Amino acid sequence: LPTPVLNTTLEGIALRTGRGTVCVVGNLADGEIAAWPDNLSGFKSLVVDMGWLKERNTDRNVCLFGYYEGEIAAGTTAVNVVLGRLVCRLNIAVSAKTAGIFSNVRIQLQNAQTKGYLFPSDVYLSPEGGGDYTEEVVIGADKVLGIAPLYRYYYMAENVTEGTDSGERTRLQIKAKKGGAEYTKAIDLGRSDIHDYSLRRNNNYTFNIVLE
């Protein structure tokens, strides 16, 4: 697919000549940043609270950010900036190894990161708690899960962890009923084979959950 391109004109803004950085922010509501700094170091310290993503149907206007860094000659009227999402997308696929066994299947994203730096940073924020998303029903109590996966999608601020601290990892909790009993399982999201549990901004991750 072609890369989306937005051509827009900003009036009343003069680009400073010389080497500099032009920062562009999209889909950020008025008032989310109390005061915009006029220097790059101040811009790099800005943190955006994206806790509102915990509720469903609020993921269509996630914040975008990009920047141009280089020489700006006198008379320059246009620069090209590539925008990326401040969040990562989690694609959760839930299915059963054998159809007709599991019912009342629910999932919940837990210990999710809700804040992130606006400018890409080598310093990362740890989850502060309160990052549990609303529990979501995958299939109700009156139906059974089949072998064809059912998908749920989440957006989350990036959670970059060293992997050694399990308390910083984002988890997916799954609840399901089987044979009249309810079972609960929590899975740390990431690459367990290489002990990498980081979920980085502007990336898509797919997790296939198969109930047995």
Per-range role (PLM):
Residues 44-86, 93-97, 190-212:
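Extracellular beta-sheet/turn segments enriched in Thr/Pro/Gly and aliphatic residues
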